[in-house]
A protein has these predicted regions:
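Small/polar-rich, solvent-exposed N-terminal microdomains that initiate assembly or binding
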Residues: 1-44, 62, 70
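Residue-identity detector for glycine
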Residues: 21, 69, 82, 95-96
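A short beta-strand signature
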Residues: 53-57
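Aromatic-residue hotspot detector
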Residues: 34-35, 78, 83, 103
Length: 120
């Protein structure tokens, strides 16, 4: 099992204050939260060869914040790590904007990433 939480935290925290799970401080926006929704074996022989990993990222910001710029930053940095964006949904909430992303990747034990796995 490959754990990318520290890497994800460091990347997202370069954009805005970041929390694993729900933000602790809702008074200062923008803020990012993330959670690993899935980390499972995609290909397995005698040992685990490739993992399938899905991260959900939430961006909470005020209406006047540059949410488009932060979304572009999140997308660029996650793509640089080898993730593929599966979903991006913008929700208008009272006094702000909530943007939900889902990113996935296949990663092997040598840290090579893939957007698809072909099974023969």
């Amino acid at each position: 099992m490959i754990n990318l939480d520290t890497i994800i935290y460091n990347v997202l925290d370069s954009i805005a204050p970041t929390y694993q799970g729900y933000p602790l401080n809702w008074n200062e926006l923008p803020v990012i939260s993330y959670v690993c929704e899935q980390n499972s074996s995609a290909i397995k022989a005698a040992e685990e060869i490739t993992d399938y990993i899905v991260y959900k990222i939430d961006l909470f910001c005020n209406i006047e914040d540059d949410d488009i710029g932060m979304c572009e930053d999140i997308n660029r940095l996650m793509n640089n790590l080898g993730f593929t964006r599966q979903q991006c949904v913008t929700l208008q909430e009272e006094g702000g904007v909530h943007i939900v992303f889902r990113y996935y990747m296949y990663i092997d034990k040598n840290n090579r990433t893939y957007s698809k796995i072909y099974r023969y």
